[in-house]
C-alpha cells in the first residue's frame, strides 16, 4: 500500500512539473496502474499458474462443457462445413484444404481420415473478432480472469484453457488463451 502511494505521488508530481497534456497522462496513468495491479496479482497465490494444475490423475476428466455460444466465432460453430462458413461470411482471404481464413480469423480442420471439410477449430490472431464474452487479442489476462474466472487448466506454456478435457491427453473441448507478457496473443476454440 505504501508503495502504491509513493508511485501515485511521484506520477502526480511529475504531471504538475512537466505541463504535459493531462488527458494523455490520465490514459498513461491508467495503463501504468493496470500493469502494476496485474504484476501484483501475478505474485499472489490467486493468479493461475501451471504448477497449481498438476495434481490430477492421467486420464481424469476435468472441467465442464462450455455453453454453445462460447464455442462460436462470427456466428460459426464447431462442426459447420467450410461451405456453410463461406455462405455465411463470404469469400475468404485465404483458403487451403486444411482451413479458410478471414483476416485474422481461421476456421480449420485438424482431423484426418474420412472426416469432411468441417470446422474442428477456430483461431483468432488479431482484433478482427472477439469471443462471445467480449475478449479479444490484445486484452489483458486479468480481463480474461475477471470474465471467465479461474481456468480449468494452465499448461507449461502458460496457456489458459476453459472447458472439458482429459488430463495428460490431447482430448480437449473448449477455449484457450495464449499470452505474451500479460496480454492475449491468440485465442483457440477447438474439440
PLM regions and their residue ranges:
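Sec-dependent signal peptide cleavage junction
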Residues: 18-36, 40
Amino acid at each position: 500500500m505504501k508503495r502504491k502511494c509513493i508511485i501515485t505521488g511521484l506520477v502526480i508530481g511529475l504531471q504538475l512539473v512537466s505541463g504535459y497534456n493531462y488527458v494523455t497522462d490520465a490514459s498513461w496513468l491508467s495503463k501504468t496502474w493496470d500493469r502494476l495491479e496485474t504484476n501484483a496479482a501475478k505474485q499472489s497465490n490467486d493468479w493461475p499458474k501451471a504448477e497449481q494444475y498438476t495434481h490430477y490423475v492421467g486420464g481424469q476428466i476435468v472441467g465442464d462443457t462450455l455453453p454453445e455460444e462460447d464455442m462460436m466465432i462470427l456466428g460459426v460453430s464447431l462442426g459447420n462445413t467450410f461451405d456453410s462458413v463461406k455462405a455465411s461470411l463470404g469469400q475468404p482471404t485465404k483458403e487451403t484444404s486444411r482451413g479458410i481464413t478471414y483476416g485474422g480469423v481461421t476456421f480449420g480442420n485438424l482431423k484426418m481420415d474420412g472426416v469432411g471439410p468441417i470446422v474442428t477449430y477456430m483461431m483468432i490472431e488479431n482484433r478482427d473478432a472477439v469471443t462471445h464474452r467480449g475478449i479479444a487479442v490484445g486484452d489483458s489476462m486479468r480481463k480474461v480472469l475477471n470474465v471467465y474466472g479461474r481456468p480449468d487448466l494452465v499448461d507449461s506454456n502458460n496457456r489458459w484453457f476453459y472447458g472439458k478435457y482429459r488430463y495428460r491427453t490431447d482430448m480437449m473441448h473448449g477455449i484457450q488463451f495464449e499470452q505474451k507478457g500479460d496480454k492475449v496473443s491468440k485465442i483457440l476454440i477447438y474439440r
